[in-house]
Amino acid sequence: MEFLYNLHSGWHVDQAIVTEEERLVVVRFGRTADRECMLMDEMLASVAEKVRNFVAIYLCDIDEVPDFNDMYELNDNMCLMFFYKNKHMMCDFGTGNNNKMNFLPDDKQELIDIMETIFRGARKNKGIVVSPYDYNHKRPSD
């Protein structure tokens, strides 16, 4: 996991988001010991080298660094959030939550496609993009 960096404080999270000027910043917020979180980390590690030219990937344990739990509503055991030039990027996944991705994509290529779509939209100054895949079926039941 040489392309995945752990962030151990709120300051480190801020610096990761603020200082990256060219690439999309993807932060996996979650509980590191959770099964779904481990699966996402494994998927991120497997795509990290392929996307390293346009994506910087970071991991943040929400129990170790609770600073953003309220601000970003980090109630899930795992979620991805996307930032570009210090701006939160939103993506319409068809789940009703455009702020974060709180589910596992079906495969690695889907994850790469999502990152690429968000990156391309961000470079065009779009605040929200539409996911290339519809995840309406992954919507949490009420």
UniProtKB/Swiss-Prot annotation:
Q: Which domain of life is it from?
A: Eukaryota
Gene Ontology CC annotation, any one: U4/U6 x U5 tri-snRNP complex
Keyword field? Cell cycle, Cell division, Mitosis, mRNA processing, mRNA splicing, Nucleus
Broad class of where this protein is predominantly found: nucleus
Q: Name one GO biological process term.
A: mRNA splicing, via spliceosome
Pfam families, per this entry?
DIM1
Subcellular location(s) per record = Nucleus
> Which family does the UniProt entry place this protein in?
Belongs to the DIM1 family.
Functional note: Essential role in pre-mRNA splicing. Also essential for entry into mitosis (G2/M progression) as well as for chromosome segregation during mitosis.
Q: How does it assemble?
A: Component of the 25S [U4/U6.U5] tri-snRNP.
Name it.
Answer: Spliceosomal protein DIB1
What organism, scientifically named, is this protein from?
Candida glabrata (strain ATCC 2001 / BCRC 20586 / JCM 3761 / NBRC 0622 / NRRL Y-65 / CBS 138) (Yeast)
- Native organism taxonomy: Eukaryota, Fungi, Dikarya, Ascomycota, Saccharomycotina
Annotated gene = DIB1
